[in-house]
Amino acid sequence: RYYFHIARDKELDLKMDPDRDQLIGEFTSPGMDYEVLLEDLPGGSFRVFKKAPKQLKDLYDLARSEETFLVFENERYTFNQVSDLAAQLGNGLLKKFNLNQGDRVAISMRNYPEWVIAFNAITSIGCVVVSMNSLWQSEEMAFALNDSGTKVLIADEERIARYAEIRSQTSVQVVSVRTERWNEIAHSWENLIDYQPSTLGCSSQPDDLATILYTSGSTGHPKGVPSSHRKILNALLSWELDAKLNVELGYVSSNTPVNQPATLLGVPLFHATGSHAVMLASYRPQRKIVSMRKWDVEQAAFLIQREQISSFV
């Protein structure tokens, strides 16, 4: 985003900016918040952020606060509330379905708050989020569920209706969100979050798998793209560093916002832009995420005014 605006307005290629290179060296030097070191990892030696959280659960725990995190219609959730609900859900998933380290749990629904809570819960208990395209039809769902080895599917009413058509082709357990229609084939979300928060620590290591996101596919089936906790967290810090560089170089205002940073979410959470660049990247800066059931211009304008939204993705 920054590159295209700057290249157009200032005819400056960031990759060739000596001031930027110097600042990167300063910001990533020993003792700094974004200190970088070379570490031997599976596949070779890589540069990593020394002070990055070790696993996604650390990211969530460090961001706990009473600031508003999610706004959906008339519902509001603080960072604390999201993490508390995720802890309850995580324990419910472990006890109800006897999940183990590395087991796959899929999410398929609209941009409901439950999407964010489920992501937090799954990655906090050492399991892997399979982020499913909510536009997929039944056969596409069947392929991804079987390809990923998913054990549990957390889905809303529309997605469960599609799953019901291919139920015999899979062996997954289903958790229903915001519907009572499918009680005969699904466990209710409400029952799972009725569990007490788990006191078990997350067993994930930095290079353990955290997510599987599917490509859109071209002439064949979509491909599952895996990411580890370390890869995701280092990406988040690299984006933070990039934003700080642009402030330092004068490309972005350095004025402190009067209101809490707030983003109107217009992209699906099943896409990396929604789940990573917006959702996960909102924890550390305590950014509020405002979403709608579906895109509506008048509602968006109303929310921008009411929530004092400063960005739109």
Question: Where are each of the predicted segments found?
Answer:
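Conserved pre-ATP/AMP-binding loop-to-beta segment of ANL
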Residues: 196-214, 221, 251-262
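Conserved AMP-binding A3 loop
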Residues: 78-80, 210-238
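Conserved AMP-binding/adenylation subdomain of ANL enzymes
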Residues: 233-263, 270-311
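Conserved AMP-binding/adenylate-forming core of the ANL superfamily
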Residues: 48, 54-57, 66-120, 137-142, ...
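Flexible, non-catalytic linker and terminal segments flanking ANL/adenylate-forming cores
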Residues: 2-52, 73
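ANL superfamily adenylate-forming
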Residues: 6, 39-41, 74, 158-207, ...
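A short helix-loop-beta submotif of the ANL/AMP-binding
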Residues: 103-104, 110-138, 146-152, 261-262, ...
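Adenylate-forming
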Residues: 110, 155-164, 181-182, 267, ...
